[in-house]
Amino acid sequence: MRHYEIVFMVHPDQSEQVAGMIERYTGSITEAGGKIHRLEDWGRRQLAYPINKLHKAHYVLMNVEAGQEVIDELETAFRFNDAVLRNMIMRTKAAITEQSIMLKQKEERAERAPRREERAEAKPEAAAE
């Protein structure tokens, strides 16, 4: 079995169906004896350029170990699913399990947000004294 990195973008109006899509795709991989090494749901993100007059899409990243038959099945599923705007399947040399840069940045922003709120609350208190 080979290692693959799969990224697909879903229509923003179909965001609530992403969990079901992920479950369906991961189920087909594991049923065929494959493994999922990393699964990241990046959420809605701005597109670099409009696709079908859309400016945002829901991104999902998966790193899997699977056979070619499963990958062919996934490609067909992506092609015939109208909610999937774009997809990319790349073969990699080894399993990638650490967090992606996109997810690390998202977590860093989430950590900084409470700090900003604390600073904003501290400034009015200091001005009142």
Curated annotation (Swiss-Prot):
<comment type="similarity">
    <text>Belongs to the bacterial ribosomal protein bS6 family.</text>
</comment>
<comment type="function">
    <text>Binds together with bS18 to 16S ribosomal RNA.</text>
</comment>
<keyword id="KW-0687">Ribonucleoprotein</keyword>
<dbReference type="GO" id="GO:0022627">
    <property type="term" value="C:cytosolic small ribosomal subunit"/>
</dbReference>
<dbReference type="InterPro" id="IPR035980">
    <property type="entry name" value="Ribosomal_bS6_sf"/>
</dbReference>
<feature type="compositionally biased region" description="Basic and acidic residues">
    <location>
        <begin position="104"/>
        <end position="129"/>
    </location>
</feature>
<dbReference type="InterPro" id="IPR000529">
    <property type="entry name" value="Ribosomal_bS6"/>
</dbReference>
<keyword id="KW-0694">RNA-binding</keyword>
<dbReference type="GO" id="GO:0006412">
    <property type="term" value="P:translation"/>
</dbReference>
<dbReference type="InterPro" id="IPR020814">
    <property type="entry name" value="Ribosomal_S6_plastid/chlpt"/>
</dbReference>
<protein>
    <recommendedName>
        <fullName>Small ribosomal subunit protein bS6</fullName>
    </recommendedName>
</protein>
<keyword id="KW-0699">rRNA-binding</keyword>
<keyword id="KW-0689">Ribosomal protein</keyword>
<dbReference type="Pfam" id="PF01250">
    <property type="entry name" value="Ribosomal_S6"/>
</dbReference>
<feature type="region of interest" description="Disordered">
    <location>
        <begin position="103"/>
        <end position="129"/>
    </location>
</feature>
<dbReference type="InterPro" id="IPR014717">
    <property type="entry name" value="Transl_elong_EF1B/ribsomal_bS6"/>
</dbReference>
<dbReference type="GO" id="GO:0003735">
    <property type="term" value="F:structural constituent of ribosome"/>
</dbReference>
<dbReference type="GO" id="GO:0070181">
    <property type="term" value="F:small ribosomal subunit rRNA binding"/>
</dbReference>
<dbReference type="InterPro" id="IPR020815">
    <property type="entry name" value="Ribosomal_bS6_CS"/>
</dbReference>
